[in-house]
Amino acid sequence: MIVSGGQNIYPAEVENAICRHPKVASAVVVGVPDDDLGHRAHALIQAADGTTAQEILDFLADELVRYKIPRSVEFIDRPLRDDAGKVRRSQMREDAIERMRNNA
């Protein structure tokens, strides 16, 4: 669970909503630090070429209440699950935070 600005966000609920988009193959949602909210939802998505973050966010506006929509979206080319089909969420979270620091 991600606590963002006092609101509870359940990653599985957000992931399921993202995966309903016709161009999305897979999604993982992790919590990343946020100066204002404590944490915020960050989506890692495998999608068809040409899919934009805005396209995903517009789609989610009809699927989720506003506070559950990820504040950031990152498209990933590599598989989001390991060979056993498991998501290594803590490792993905740390990798995402590191990429954000490097891009800041």
What is each model feature region?
Residues 20, 53, 74, 99-100:
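Short amphipathic alpha-helical leader/targeting segments
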Residues 54, 89-104:
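AMP-dependent adenylate-forming
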Residues 17, 36, 76, 84-85, ...:
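Intrinsically disordered, low-complexity regions of eukaryotic proteins
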Residues 1-68, 94:
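AMP-binding/adenylate-forming catalytic core of the ANL superfamily
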Residues 65-86:
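AMP-binding/adenylate-forming catalytic domain of the ANL superfamily
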Residues 2, 80, 87, 92:
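Short clusters of hydrophobic/aromatic residues that line enzyme substrate/ligand-binding pockets
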